[in-house]
């Protein structure tokens, strides 16, 4: 019994008949195992008395655990479904913890009484710092020292300090879980009735959520570097917090507050006792099995009951007319949602840890090599890179990230661009490449046609996340999850240019700028439909269409964002991955980025249209040579492909297209509109001959 290895000691202490007699095993933390034959109807105190005679551990210090549940003294073994062959884990409480009936009144009569128990450089269980008061500036301490001390103690996880008192208040938990406090003046006291609620809420917001608010007084003298716990330890702590929160939700509105607090402290003591076991036990498959059983109990009993209660309230919400009751149900739904969000992070970490189980060839090789936790921490879930809502600093268990998205009745109050509904419309067409100064009206027609096409296709290809009749910048009401869509119209390689392109080229002249945009938009839509029909049928268009003089790929990207002017310029830009993909898909193509959300102005290489086209010509003049060189290089690359497609018809127009590339460059660059009009007459005469 004094050995550190595995030792089995058999003892028959059964007093009942053979039908109710079972054989159980008592396993201690030092791997000692005791086999007992007991009666299923035996009370738990009687079992503890028998275990005391075998192990020497007093019954007051014994904590028996069976299948993740702590055996209570007022229950029988049969209440915990203890069967033959089950193993009960024996955990001994700390010997310095005094029983509830023997609380001395002189435990803190001296200022250094807390160091008389031998807590030198280790975190002693049972002694916690509740409040550490730093003197204010009126006491002669500079504010810089206050900030330094606050920063140091804040990095340790201590809560904020009060500035109106002196001394360090120590809270010592007894076995009932209520605890007592004593300061350095030597006045132990029980919490007052008005302070009890504050202490319970303080535990709910700090200690019960895993923040390291418990630091021994001796450790303040020499701070030790924190040890990163493994995933099983973190899972146990995290599961304890979830257990407490589900208990709080289940007991909402109840009157048995003291029983709930006692149950909470009992479960906390169970977790702290489990965490004080050896590292070998924490990495064993048996420890993982206990975590799995505890998870099963929480999901079935507590999470299931929480879901059932919320579902019943939601089913009967139509019969509830009291605003206070509806507000309470709303608050309960929010808390339940946050709890299941935290439970989902726990299940992610549990799944990751379970996948690290390695049984090996022999039982001695079995190990759970989980390492530190990834998805969770003792204080709450770790925020991963992609979140439906922005990161809330300090958000952990019980913190509901609501309210920030409703500032100023819009979604622009400090939220990231990923929360705004955004639609990226990419239109790829073939036409003459012109400078931004001489092609403003063509961009306007193309943009209107793109909007009409996307409006018709929205029911099939995309789902909008805002109402069409609401404003973009400050839309009130409820928003849904934003959906980003990308619609790309890939051109046919042998597409011919219709008369609308010629009209667009002529429309840039000052004399013909007054023609209506709906007319050109309708022509462009009809031309696009006819081209798509001919491409699907595998036939060329009718001879009455004019061939494209200078074919080039022009990519227009329109960004429609619901954020309006509140978005930054970097948030409205097209992602670089999209631009790289388009450049790789269309090498040598010209990409124009337009942003209608910034009050009609365009971002990128396209500038805003003005009423006078002549005023834009001097601005576009420096870019003519660069555009001409670009178009010339582009034509050299696509001319062989165009020759193959057009040469199949045996038409002499192939010679005309390949004979005069320099003229096409001039037409595409927009340097001579009259020359383009004069040179367009030969194709018209040939078309009349063919007719």
From Swiss-Prot:
GO biological process: ERAD pathway; nodulation
Domain Ubiquitin-like: residue ranges: 22-97
Biased composition (Basic and acidic residues): 525-535
Tissue expr: Highly epressed in roots. Expressed at very low levels in leaves and stems.
PTMs per UniProt: Phosphorylated at the N-terminus by CCAMK.
InterPro entries: Ubiquitin-like_dom (IPR000626), Ubiquitin-like_domsf (IPR029071), Ubiquitin_dom (IPR019956)
Predominant localisation class: nucleus
Location in the cell: Nucleus
Molecular function per GO: misfolded protein binding; polyubiquitin modification-dependent protein binding
Assembly and oligomerization: Interacts with CCAMK.
PANTHER family with a match to the protein in the record: LARGE PROLINE-RICH PROTEIN BAG6
Protein name per the record: Ubiquitin-like domain-containing protein CIP73
Organism: Lotus japonicus (Lotus corniculatus var. japonicus)
């Amino acid at each position: 019994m004094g050995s550190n290895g595995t030792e089995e000691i058999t003892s028959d202490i059964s007093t009942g008949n053979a039908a109710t007699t079972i054989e159980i095993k008592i396993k201690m933390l030092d791997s000692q195992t005791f086999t007992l034959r007991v009666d299923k109807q035996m009370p738990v105190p009687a079992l503890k008395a028998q275990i005391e005679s075998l192990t020497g551990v007093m019954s007051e210090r014994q904590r028996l655990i069976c299948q993740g549940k702590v055996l209570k003294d007022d229950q029988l073994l049969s209440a915990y479904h203890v069967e033959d062959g089950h193993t009960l884990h024996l955990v001994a409480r700390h010997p310095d913890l005094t029983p509830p009936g023997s609380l001395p009144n002189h435990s803190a009569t001296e200022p250094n009484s807390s160091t008389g128990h031998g807590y030198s450089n280790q975190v002693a269980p049972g002694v916690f710092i509740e409040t550490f008061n730093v003197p204010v500036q009126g006491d002669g301490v500079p504010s810089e020292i206050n900030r330094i001390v606050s920063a140091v103690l804040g990095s340790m996880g201590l809560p904020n300090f009060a500035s109106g008192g002196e001394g360090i208040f120590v809270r010592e938990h007894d076995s009932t879980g209520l605890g007592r406090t004593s300061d350095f003046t030597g006045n132990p006291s029980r919490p007052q009735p008005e302070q009890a609620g504050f202490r319970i809420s303080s535990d709910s917001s700090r200690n019960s959520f895993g923040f390291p608010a418990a630091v021994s007084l001796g450790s303040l003298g020499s701070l030790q570097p924190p040890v990163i716990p493994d995933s099983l330890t973190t899972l146990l702590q995290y599961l304890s917090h979830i257990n407490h929160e589900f208990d709080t939700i289940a007991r909402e509105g109840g009157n048995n507050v003291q029983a709930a607090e006692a149950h909470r402290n009992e479960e906390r003591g169970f977790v702290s006792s489990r965490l004080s076991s050896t590292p070998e036990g924490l990495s064993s498959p048996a420890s993982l099995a206990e975590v799995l059983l505890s998870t099963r109990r929480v999901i079935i009993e507590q999470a299931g009951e929480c879901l059932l209660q919320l579902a019943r309230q939601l089913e009967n919400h139509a019969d509830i007319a009291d605003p206070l009751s509806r507000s309470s149900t709303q608050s309960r739904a929010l808390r339940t949602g946050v709890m299941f969000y935290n439970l989902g992070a726990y299940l992610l970490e549990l799944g990751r840890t379970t996948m690290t189980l390695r049984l090996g060839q022999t039982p001695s090789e079995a190990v759970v090599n989980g390492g530190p936790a990834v998805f969770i921490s003792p204080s709450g879930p770790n925020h991963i890179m992609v979140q439906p809502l922005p990161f809330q600093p300090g958000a952990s268990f019980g913190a509901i990230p609501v309210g920030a998205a409703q500032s100023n009745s819009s979604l622009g109050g400090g939220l990231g661009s990923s929360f705004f509904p955004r639609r990226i419309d990419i239109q790829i067409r073939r036409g003459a490449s012109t400078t931004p100064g001489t092609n403003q009206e063509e961009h306007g027609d193309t943009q209107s046609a793109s909007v009409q096409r996307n409006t018709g296709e929205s029911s099939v290809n995309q789902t909008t996340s805002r109402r069409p009749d609401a404003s973009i910048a400050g839309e009130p009401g409820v928003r849904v999850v934003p959906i980003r869509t990308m619609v790309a119209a890939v051109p046919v390689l042998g597409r011919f240019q219709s008369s609308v392109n010629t009209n667009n080229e002529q429309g840039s002249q000052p004399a013909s700028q007054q023609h209506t945009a709906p007319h050109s938009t309708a022509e462009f839509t009809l031309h696009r439909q006819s081209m798509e029909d001919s491409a699907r049928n595998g036939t060329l268009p009718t001879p009455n269409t004019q061939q494209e003089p200078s074919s080039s790929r022009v990519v227009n990207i329109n960004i429609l964002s619901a954020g309006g002017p509140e978005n930054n310029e970097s948030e409205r830009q097209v992602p670089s991955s999209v631009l790289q993909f388009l450049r790789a898909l269309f090498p040598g193509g010209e990409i124009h980025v337009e942003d209608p959300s910034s009050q009609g102005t365009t971002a990128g290489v396209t500038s805003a249209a003005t009423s006078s086209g002549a005023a834009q010509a001097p601005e576009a003049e420096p870019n003519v040579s660069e555009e001409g060189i670009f178009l010339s290089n582009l034509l050299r690359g696509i001319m062989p492909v165009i020759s193959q497609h057009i040469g199949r018809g045996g038409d002499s127009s192939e010679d005309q297209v390949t004979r005069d590339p320099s003229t096409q460059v001039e037409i595409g660059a927009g340097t001579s509109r009259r020359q383009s009009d004069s040179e367009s007459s030969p194709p018209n005469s040939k078309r009349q001959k063919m007719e």
